C-alpha cells in the first residue's frame, strides 16, 4: 500500500514539474503589445466556438437566441457581437404625430434612418413662421386700434371697442401659438448617423422602460413651505403643504420611480377632500412626495410683491399666460388671488371694518408689524384674557399707535420696570390677534400662515420682529425651534443666511437665532436650492392656490399626448438586438408582452405605471422588429414563460455556454489574445510580459478544476488581469511581470476566499480545526465556498444505544441539503456490510461542526464514513489528515470538484496529508512552494482511505481486513469518473458559508 502512495505522488509531482517549464503558448512574443487584437467583437469571443457559429447564423437569418450558462462566460459580449453583424441599411427612425381625430391615440410613422430629424426640423420651421405671422397680426391689430382711437379724438366708445378687439386678438393668437407648437412631431427613435445596428441591454428594466410609457406631465413641485387651503368633509383648514402631505402619507397608496427620484403618493379620489383654487374649491386627486436630488428655483419680486420656490418646470399663471417657473423674469406679473385671512361672527370687529380681513387689505402690513413685535417680546395668556408686551419704550409706543389706528380708543396700562411693559385686556384686540395666530403662553411658536402669502407681509413682520439676534431660554427647545427654522428658510429667499444654535444652560435650553444683516437692497432676488424632498398636489381642475398664487399642478396634463410618449427598449432595439440577462426575473406579464412584441413586431405604447398618465393614452402600434438575445442560468429555464421559451426555441436557437475548454496550444494562444484584449479595453494598465501571461494561463488551468482544461469564466480571469495591471501602475512599471500577477492573486482574492481564510484562522485559534494527534470519531473534511475557495470542515460522529427498540437511526446535524443528507445515508450501506451484525441497536450521530449556513453536495461522503467507522470501532483518526471524495454504496471513492482549492485550504490549516479521489489526481494545480507543504494521496476505495486516516493499531489491521473481505472492491481506475461535471464541481459539492454571521 505504501508503494502505491509513493507512485501516486511521483506521478502527480512529475506532471506539475512539467508545468513549471516554459509553456508553449502557440505564439512567440515578448509582451502583449505585439499581439494583434481583432476589431470585430465576434472575433474577440474566446472558447465559445459553437456559440459564435450560432450567433453568426442567427444574425444572418434574424433568429432569436437563448444563452444559458454561468456568469462571466461571455453572454453579453455575444449579444453585442450580433449587433455588429447586422446590416445598417434597414435602420429606421420612428416619429409620433398628434392625432386630430383622437388626441389620446397618437399616430406613428417610420422613415429611413436620418430623415426623422429633418422632418422634425421642418415642422419646427413652420411653427416659427406661424409665430412670426402671429406677431405681425398683433402688430397690425394694435396699429388699427391706435389709428381708430386717434381719428376718433379719444372717443370713449372707440377706446372701449379697441380694448375689446385687442383682447380678442390676444386670445386668438395665444391659441394659435399653442396649436402650432402642438403640431410638431416627436422623434421617438433616432438612428441617424449609426454605424452599426442598435444594441439595447434591457437587463432589470421595469415595465415602462422595457415596453414604453406615457409619462405624466412633468411633476411640478413645491418646496412644501407653501400655504394651501383645504376643505375636508366641509371643514376649511389652512395648512402648510408639507404638513398636509406628510400626514396623508402616513397611509401611502403606493410608490414608484420617476427617473432617479422616488415618488410616494396618497390617492384622494375616493375621499371628500378639496383644495382652494381661483374659482373656488376643486377635488383633490393625489398628494405626492418626491424623494431624490432636485432643484428649486426661488424667486422674490418685491416690486410685483410675489415670491415662490418651485421646480423649474412648474407652470405658473401670469398675465401673459402660462409660464414655467424657470422662465419667470422680473417683468412678469403673476396672478394672485385674494384669500380670506380672518373672519368670524363678531359684531364689534365688523363695525370697525376689520372683518372679513382679506390678503389684499392694505392694513394687513401694519397688522404683520404688530405680530412681529408681539412674537419678539409678547404673548397672550392661556386664558386669553390679557395681552402682555415687554420691550423698549419706543416699540411700545409704536405698538399702541397702530392698535389705535385699527381699533380706536382702548384701555391699556404701561408699567415701567427694567423694561417697559404694556398690558391690555381689550377683548376685541385679543380675539382679533388670537384669530391671526398671535403667540399664546404655553403653546408652540408658529409663524402666522398669512404672513407667508407675500414678501411685503413677511418684511413687515420682520420689521416688527426687528432683532437680528434673538436668545430665548426655554424648557423644551422643540416647541420654539420650528418657528426659527421656518423664519430662517424664508430669510434664505432673500439671500440671508441665518444660524440657529441650541445650548444647554443648567436644566434649560437657550435658542440662539443670528440672522446677521436684515437689509434687503434688491427688488428681484433669485436663488437656487438643491433639495432632497419636494411636494405637490394633483387636482381635478389642474390648478390650485399656493400662498395665494395661481399655479398649475401635475394633474393638468397640459403637454400634448404625443409629446409625453416615451419609447421602450423594445422600440429602441428596432432592427437591432435586445439583450436581456436573467430574463426569468421579468414578471410573467412582462414576458407575455415581450412575446407579443416578438410575434407582431409592433407594440403600442401606453401607461405602464402609477406615475404615467394612465391607459387613456395609447399610441398606434410602434415597430419593434428586434432580435432577442436572452440569457440566464440553468434555473432560468424553469422560471421562463413557457410560450416565450417555445417562441425562442421554435424561431431561433438555444445555446449552453461552456465553462472550460481543452488545454491545447491553440486555446492557450486564444488566452494570450484575451490578455491583450483586456489591456486594450481597460486603457489604464500596461501590457503583460510573456512570463506574466504564462502565470495567467496557469491560473486558468487551476480555475478550470479539470485535468487538461482551461477556464472560460473569463470575467473573473479579467479581474486578475486588471488587478495585476493596477499593481504594476502603482509600482511605476512599464510592463506587468509574473511577480505582479502573483501579488494580484493574493490581493484580489474573492470574498469567499477571504471568508475561508478568516474561517480557518478563527477555527484554528479556537481549536475547532485540529491538526495534531488522533481522535475517535473526528475527521477533517474539505468543502467549497462559492466557486473557487476551499475550507476545512470538521466532522464528528458518536455511537449511542438506540432510542427506539424497533430500529436505530442515523441522526445528522449541520443544516445539510438534500444531496448531502442522502450521501450520509449511503454510508450506512457500507457499515452494515462490513460490520456483519445488526446495527439497528445503535443511533449514529453525525455533526458538521458550526455550519450555520448549510452544507450541500456529496463530497464529504468519505469523511462521514471514516468518522462513523472510527466511532463504531473506537479507532482514532489522524488529525493531520484531511480528505474529500464521494462514496458509492460499493465502497468506491468517486471524483468531486474543486480539489485544488480544497487542498490549498488544508495547507493553510497546517494539515500534512490530504486524501483525494484517484480520478481527480490530474486535476490538482499547485505552485511548487505549496506542493512541498503537503502529501497528496489519491485513493480508489474506502479501505485505502482508512489505511491512511486511522491511527496504526491491531484493531485497524483487523478492520481493514474485514472490509476487504466483505465489500465488492477492485474497480477500475476510471470508475465513476464520468460523474464529474463539466464545470469542475461535484453534484452540488458546495458549502454556502458557514460563520459569515458568527
Curated annotation (Swiss-Prot):
Sites where the protein binds ATP: 69-76
Gene3D superfamilies from the UniProt entry: 1.10.8.60, 3.30.230.10, Hedgehog/Intein (Hint) domain (2.170.16.10), P-loop containing nucleotide triphosphate hydrolases (3.40.50.300)
Protein's cellular compartments: Cell membrane
Any single Pfam family the record assigns to this protein: Lon_C
PROSITE patterns: INTEIN_C_TER (PS50818), INTEIN_ENDONUCLEASE (PS50819), INTEIN_N_TER (PS50817), LON_PROTEOLYTIC (PS51786)
Extracellular side: 153-155
Active site (record annotation): 859, 902
GO cellular component: plasma membrane
Keywords of the record: ATP-binding, Autocatalytic cleavage, Cell membrane, Endonuclease, Hydrolase, Intron homing, Membrane, Nuclease, Nucleotide-binding, Protease, Protein splicing, Serine protease, Transmembrane, Transmembrane helix
Occurrences of domain Lon proteolytic (ranges): 773-952
Protein name: Archaeal Lon protease
Organism: Pyrococcus abyssi (strain GE5 / Orsay)
Amino acid at each position: 500500500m505504501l508503494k502505491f502512495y509513493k507512485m501516486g505522488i511521483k506521478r502527480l509531482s512529475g506532471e506539475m514539474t512539467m508545468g513549471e517549464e516554459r509553456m508553449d503558448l502557440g505564439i512567440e512574443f515578448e509582451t502583449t503589445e505585439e499581439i494583434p487584437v481583432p476589431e470585430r467583437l465576434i472575433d474577440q469571443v474566446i472558447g465559445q466556438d459553437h456559440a459564435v457559429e450560432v450567433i453568426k447564423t442567427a444574425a444572418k437569418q434574424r433568429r432569436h437566441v437563448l444563452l444559458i450558462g454561468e456568469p462571466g462566460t461571455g453572454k453579453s459580449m455575444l449579444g453585442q457581437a450580433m449587433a455588429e453583424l447586422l446590416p445598417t441599411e434597414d435602420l429606421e427612425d420612428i416619429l409620433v404625430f398628434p392625432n386630430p381625430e383622437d388626441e389620446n391615440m397618437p399616430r406613428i410613422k417610420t422613415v429611413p434612418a436620418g430623415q426623422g430629424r429633418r422632418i422634425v426640423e421642418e415642422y419646427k420651421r413652420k411653427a416659427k413662421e406661424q409665430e412670426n405671422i402671429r406677431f405681425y397680426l398683433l402688430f397690425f391689430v394694435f396699429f388699427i386700434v391706435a389709428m381708430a382711437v386717434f381719428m376718433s379724438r379719444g372717443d370713449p366708445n372707440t377706446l372701449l371697442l379697441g380694448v375689446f378687439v385687442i383682447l380678442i386678438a390676444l386670445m386668438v393668437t395665444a391659441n394659435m401659438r399653442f396649436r402650432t407648437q402642438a403640431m410638431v412631431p416627436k422623434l421617438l427613435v433616432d438612428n441617424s448617423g449609426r454605424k452599426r445596428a442598435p444594441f439595447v441591454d434591457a437587463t432589470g428594466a421595469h415595465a415602462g422602460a422595457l415596453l414604453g410609457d406615457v409619462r405624466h406631465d412633468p411633476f411640478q413641485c413645491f418646496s412644501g413651505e407653501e400655504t394651501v387651503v383645504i376643505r375636508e368633509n366641509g371643514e376649511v383648514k389652512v395648512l402648510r403643504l408639507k404638513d398636509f402631505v406628510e400626514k396623508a402619507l402616513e397611509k401611502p397608496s403606493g410608490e414608484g420611480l420617476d427617473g432617479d427620484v422616488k415618488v410616494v403618493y396618497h390617492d384622494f379620489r375616493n375621499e371628500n377632500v378639496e383644495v382652494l383654487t381661483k374659482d373656488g374649491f376643486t377635488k383633490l386627486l393625489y398628494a405626492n412626495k418626491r424623494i431624490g436630488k432636485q432643484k428649486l428655483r426661488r424667486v422674490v419680486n418685491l416690486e410685483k410683491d410675489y415670491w415662490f420656490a418651485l421646480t423649474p418646470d412648474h407652470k405658473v399663471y401670469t398675465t401673459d399666460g402660462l409660464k414655467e417657473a424657470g422662465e419667470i423674469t422680473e417683468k412678469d406679473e403673476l396672478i394672485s388671488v385674494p384669500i380670506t385671512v380672518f373672519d368670524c361672527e363678531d359684531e364689534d370687529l365688523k363695525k370697525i371694518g376689520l372683518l372679513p380681513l382679506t390678503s389684499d387689505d392694505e392694513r394687513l402690513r401694519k397688522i404683520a408689524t404688530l405680530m412681529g413685535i408681539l412674537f419678539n417680546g409678547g404673548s397672550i395668556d392661556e386664558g386669553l384674557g390679557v395681552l402682555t408686551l415687554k420691550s423698549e419704550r419706543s416699540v411700545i409706543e409704536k405698538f399702541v399707535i397702530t392698535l389705535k389706528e385699527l381699533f380706536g380708543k382702548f384701555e391699556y396700562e404701561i408699567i415701567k420696570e427694567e423694561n417697559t411693559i404694556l398690558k391690555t385686556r381689550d377683548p376685541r384686540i385679543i380675539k382679533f390677534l388670537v384669530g391671526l395666530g398671535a403667540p399664546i403662553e404655553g403653546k408652540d411658536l408658529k409663524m402666522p400662515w398669512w404672513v407667508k402669502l407675500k414678501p411685503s407681509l413677511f418684511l413687515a413682520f420682520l420689521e416688527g420682529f426687528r432683532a437680528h439676534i434673538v436668545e430665548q431660554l426655554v424648557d423644551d427647545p422643540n416647541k420654539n425651534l420650528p418657528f426659527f427654522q421656518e423664519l430662517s428658510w424664508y430669510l434664505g429667499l432673500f439671500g440671508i443666511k441665518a444660524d440657529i444654535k441650541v445650548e444647554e444652560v443648567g436644566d434649560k435650553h437657550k435658542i440662539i437665532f443670528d440672522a446677521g444683516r436684515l437689509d434687503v437692497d434688491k427688488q428681484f432676488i433669485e436663488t437656487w436650492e438643491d433639495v432632497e424632498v419636494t411636494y405637490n398636489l394633483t387636482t381635478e381642475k389642474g390648478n390650485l392656490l399656493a400662498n395665494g398664487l395661481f399655479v398649475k399642478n401635475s394633474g393638468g396634463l397640459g403637454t400634448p399626448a404625443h409629446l409625453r410618449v416615451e419609447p421602450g427598449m423594445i422600440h429602441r432595439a428596432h432592427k437591432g438586438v435586445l439583450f436581456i440577462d436573467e430574463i426569468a426575473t421579468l414578471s410573467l406579464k412582462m414576458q407575455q408582452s415581450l412575446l407579443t412584441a416578438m410575434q407582431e413586431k409592433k407594440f403600442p405604447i401606453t401607461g405602464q405605471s402609477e406615475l404615467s398618465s394612465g391607459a387613456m393614452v395609447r399610441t398606434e402600434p410602434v415597430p419593434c422588429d428586434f432580435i432577442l438575445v436572452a440569457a440566464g442560468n440553468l434555473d432560468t429555464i424553469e422560471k421562463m414563460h413557457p410560450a416565450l421559451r417555445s417562441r425562442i426555441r421554435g424561431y431561433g436557437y438555444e445555446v449552453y455556454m461552456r465553462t472550460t475548454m481543452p488545454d491545447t496550444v491553440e486555446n492557450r494562444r486564444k488566452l494570450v489574445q484575451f490578455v491583450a484584449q483586456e489591456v486594450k479595453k481597460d486603457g489604464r494598465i500596461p501590457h503583460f510580459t510573456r512570463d506574466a501571461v504564462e502565470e495567467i494561463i496557469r491560473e486558468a488551468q487551476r480555475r478550470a478544476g479539470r485535468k487538461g482544461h482551461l477556464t472560460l469564466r473569463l470575467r473573473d480571469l479579467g479581474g486578475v488581469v486588471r488587478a495585476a495591471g493596477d499593481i504594476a501602475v502603482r509600482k511605476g512599471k512599464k510592463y506587468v511581470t509574473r511577480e505582479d500577477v502573483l501579488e494580484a492573486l493574493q490581493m484580489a482574492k474573492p470574498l469567499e476566499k477571504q471568508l475561508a481564510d478568516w474561517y480557518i484562522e478563527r477555527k484554528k485559534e479556537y481549536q475547532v480545526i485540529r491538526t495534531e494527534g488522533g481522535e475517535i470519531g473526528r475527521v477533517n473534511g474539505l468543502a467549497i465556498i462559492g466557486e473557487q475557495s476551499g475550507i476545512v470542515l470538521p466532522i464528528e460522529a458518536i455511537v449511542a444505544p438506540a432510542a427506539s427498540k424497533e430500529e436505530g437511526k442515523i441522526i445528522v446535524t449541520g443544516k445539510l441539503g438534500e444531496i448531502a443528507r442522502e450521501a450520509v445515508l449511503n454510508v450506512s450501506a457500507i457499515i452494515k456490510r462490513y460490520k456483519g451484525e445488526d446495527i439497528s441497536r445503535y443511533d449514529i450521530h453525525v455533526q458538521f461542526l458550526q455550519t450555520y449556513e448549510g452544507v450541500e453536495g456529496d463530497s464529504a461522503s468519505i469523511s462521514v464514513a471514516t468518522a462513523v467507522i472510527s466511532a463504531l470501532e473506537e479507532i482514532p483518526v489522524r488529525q493531520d489528515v484531511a480528505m474529500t471524495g464521494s462514496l458509492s454504496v460499493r465502497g468506491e471513492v468517486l471524483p468531486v470538484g474543486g480539489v485544488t482549492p480544497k487542498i490549498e485550504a488544508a495547507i493553510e490549516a497546517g494539515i500534512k496529508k490530504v486524501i483525494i479521489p484517484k480520478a481527480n489526481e490530474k486535476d490538482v494545480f499547485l505552485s511548487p512552494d505549496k506542493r512541498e507543504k503537503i502529501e497528496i494521496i489519491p485513493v480508489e476505495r474506502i479501505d485505502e482511505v482508512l489505511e491512511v486516516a486511522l491511527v496504526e493499531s491491531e484493531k485497524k489491521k483487523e478492520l481493514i481486513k474485514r472490509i476487504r473481505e466483505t465489500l465488492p472492491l477492485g474497480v477500475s481506475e476510471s470508475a465513476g469518473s464520468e460523474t464529474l461535471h463539466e464545470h469542475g464541481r461535484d453534484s452540488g459539492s458546495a458549502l454556502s458559508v458557514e460563520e459569515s454571521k458568527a
